[in-house]
């Protein structure tokens, strides 16, 4: 169903209306492999139709993400920031550009990106660009006036400084070997309530010892674990619904696993999840982030980024340093491309020392 470009009198309300429609469309087109409760997704779709403020849209998108539509915030945050920019600019300026959606052009979007993405990482800036391109491409296809004509923006954002350049090889934040040992000790030392102690310690240790992604760990099921010859083989459902297996020495987690499985029997577990809250639902990535950050602070190891993904980088760095095998890193982490794994060669101390010693050779 197509809609007039400007149904309402206020251009900021019209912009919000289109953002809501686009986000609803994205909710139906994003990967739903992590969705466990379809009813929650239906609720979100219905609420997106009714949302009449940016705060309501933000709330619904968070709910959709928690329901398993993990990529929705990649679009929601930039677009709601653009709505904020458009609304503020309309109030404090007398420029006619903000009196109609038809006046939105590349210049305005470049100004928005310049103001709102300063200090953000290149990857985040690219997400802003992708979200804007997605929105205006959607509007191009979905708007139609009473004469069945559409207003076409044809936004490309090809010449935006700092957004189109190559991402380069930014070194990921990680813990070195000694710091990882300290972090592991802190997992056991930090105080936790009896109900979550075994669960949280088990969850975080599995991530440390395998390097799996946080959402992969949160979706693990008991049937994914096989014990043989003192090792657990863990079947992981990764990106693109691709499966891979990792191995973990049983002694690292065995006592915690037994303790948690006893506690877990008290909960109405849904979908055979290994890790769940007291309602039986999956834990959120936000909760996991807070728990990891709490342990990092306790250990005195605070970094720029303190979530579970840093533990993944730490595992990969240590794996490459000890084995010097990029294929092994790629397979263990589930990277689709070897180039993604190549970043960890920058942490190869042996190679760096060899480079530094060339001036001492005859």
Curated annotation (Swiss-Prot):
It is found in: Cytoplasm. The active site is at residues 213, 239, 309, 312, 335, 344. FtsK is required for recombination. InterPro entries: CB, DNA_brk_join_enz, Integrase-like_cat_sf, Integrase_catalytic, Tyrosine_recombinase_XerCD, Xer_N, XerH. Keywords: Cell cycle, Cell division, Chromosome partition, Cytoplasm, DNA integration, DNA recombination, DNA-binding. Gene3D superfamilies: Intergrase catalytic core. PANTHER family: PHAGE INTEGRASE-RELATED, PROPHAGE INTEGRASE INTD-RELATED. This is Tyrosine recombinase XerH. It comes from Helicobacter pylori (strain ATCC 700392 / 26695) (Campylobacter pylori).
């Amino acid at each position: 169903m197509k809609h007039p470009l400007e149904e309402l009198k206020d251009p900021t309300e019209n912009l919000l209306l289109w953002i809501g429609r686009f986000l609803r469309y994205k909710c139906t087109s994003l990967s739903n492999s992590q969705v466990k409760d379809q009813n929650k997704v239906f609720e979100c779709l219905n609420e997106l139709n009714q949302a009449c403020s940016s705060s309501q849209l933000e709330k619904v998108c968070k709910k959709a993400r928690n329901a398993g539509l993990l990529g929705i915030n990649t679009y929601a945050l930039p677009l709601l920031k653009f709505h904020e920019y458009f609304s503020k600019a309309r109030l404090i300026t007398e420029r006619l550009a903000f009196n109609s959606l038809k006046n939105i052009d590349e210049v305005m979007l470049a100004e928005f990106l310049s103001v709102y993405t300063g200090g953000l990482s290149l990857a985040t800036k690219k997400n802003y660009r992708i979200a804007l391109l997605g929105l205006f491409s959607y509007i191009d296809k979905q708007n139609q006036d009473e004469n069945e004509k559409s207003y076409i923006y044809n936004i490309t954002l090809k010449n935006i400084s700092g957004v189109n350049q190559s991402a380069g090889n930014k070194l990921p934040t990680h813990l070195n070997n000694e710091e990882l040992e300290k972090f592991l000790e802190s997992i056991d030392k930090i105080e936790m309530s009896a109900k979550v102690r075994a669960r949280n310690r088990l969850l975080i240790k599995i991530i440390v010892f395998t390097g799996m992604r946080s959402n992969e760990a949160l979706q693990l099921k008991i049937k994914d674990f096989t014990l043989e010859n003192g090792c657990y083989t863990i079947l992981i459902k990764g990106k693109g619904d691709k499966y891979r297996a990792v191995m973990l020495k049983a002694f690292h987690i065995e006592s915690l696993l037994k303790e948690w499985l006893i506690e877990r029997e008290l909960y109405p577990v849904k979908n055979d999840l290994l890790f769940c809250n007291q309602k039986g639902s999956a834990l959120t990535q936000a909760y996991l982030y807070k728990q990891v950050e709490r342990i990092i602070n306790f250990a005195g190891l605070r970094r720029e980024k303190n979530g579970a993904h840093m533990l993944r980088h730490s595992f990969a760095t240590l794996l490459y340093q000890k084995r010097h095998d990029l294929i092994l890193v790629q397979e263990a982490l589930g990277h689709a491309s070897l180039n993604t794994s190549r970043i960890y060669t920058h942490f190869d101390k042996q190679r760096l020392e060899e480079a530094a010693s060339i001036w001492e050779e005859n």
